[in-house]
């Protein structure tokens, strides 16, 4: 984003640069619950690495999957770009990223199988950043 801001040229449509940061967030009431909700994402990471492009798995499918040690290593490595946790945890992971990129807006996706849990994740995240 630094390059974008450094080379930005005003236009009739945009007088100044405006950057949107896109990221993945799974937010729940507790870190443990958020980690549990992220298990289907872990399984999708494993499946995609094996060339399997399937819809987001359910919590039950993720729990029943027979993970290899390589699968587990891949899951741990790919959790890094995700913000997973309770509201305070998610804020603590996102704020340095927002500050470093000087993002004007945050665009979030939440790959959560349950519609209600996904909606709750967005509600918690909205409370975290309301007035921030």
Residue ranges and their predicted role:
Residues 1-102, 130-132:
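An alpha-helical appendage that flanks or caps ligand/catalytic pockets
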Residues 98-132:
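Generic C-terminus detector
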């Amino acid at each position: 984003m630094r390059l974008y801001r450094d080379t930005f040229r005003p236009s009739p449509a945009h007088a100044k640069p405006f950057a949107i940061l896109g990221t993945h967030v799974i937010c729940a009431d507790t870190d443990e619950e958020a980690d549990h909700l992220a298990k289907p994402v872990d399984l999708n990471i494993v499946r995609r690495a094996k060339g399997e492009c399937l819809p987001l798995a359910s919590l039950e499918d993720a729990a029943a999957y027979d993970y290899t040690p390589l699968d587990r290593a891949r899951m741990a490595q790919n959790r890094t770009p995700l913000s997973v946790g309770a509201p305070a945890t998610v804020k603590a992971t996102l704020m340095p990223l927002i500050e470093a990129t000087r993002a004007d807006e945050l665009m979030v996706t939440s790959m959560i199988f349950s519609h209600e849990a996904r909606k709750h994740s967005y509600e918690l995240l909205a409370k975290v950043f309301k007035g921030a």
